[in-house]
Amino acid sequence: AAEAYMIVSHPQWQRARQMVADGAIGRVLHITGGFSYDNSDDPQNIRNQAAMGGGGLRDIGVYVLGSARYVMGADLENISAKIRLESGFDTFASMQGNMGDATYSAYVSTRMHPHQEMVFHGSAGLLRLTAPFNANIFGEARIELHQPNLGLRVERFPAANHYVNQVEAFGHSIRTGAAYPWTLEQARGTQEAIDTILAIGTDLA
């Protein structure tokens, strides 16, 4: 079983994972992420309906959490969180913890100006994805590799479509039995982290 989790079918994420595994930024020490948009003017939206499983964490928390888990190959542990609720659903959540040896800090919001970014900060460099989740819609998909002595290498992915790639990967898996890039077990791990954040998060005024 698998989940239709499109970002892992995008070459920018496949490349980011490979670069981290190859030691391009040294030892990963800290991960930061953010994903926000504002749908406050649409009260009937399912994301604004507590009874229908609304809230930012269930909608976009899967991306700031799942993407980091994909790159690091580790689960979020030692979790702490702060949550702002509105009519029973979260409109802002900040979360902290550890993924392997790295610390982790991220936020999601459905009441803030649109923004998305993921950063992997290592002992020998920094990897930044500028449009990590809505590639070529929010902005051009690209990876910035910041290196010593103000070195900067940028890899661009202007033509990639992760939805097309996802369908092709699914078809390839069906035809050949090849592993699908995001299993049900991986999806469950992200959902367990979200459930923990919702359960232990401290309410913000």
Q: Where are these predicted regions, by residue range?
A:
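C-terminal helix-rich "cap/oligomerization" subdomain common to oxidoreductases
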Residues: 169-205
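A general structural signal for well-ordered alpha-helical segments in protein cores
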Residues: 13, 64-65, 137-140, 163-168, ...
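Short polybasic amphipathic segments
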Residues: 118, 137-148
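Predominantly a Rossmann-like dinucleotide-binding segment in NAD(P)-dependent oxidoreductases
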Residues: 7-79
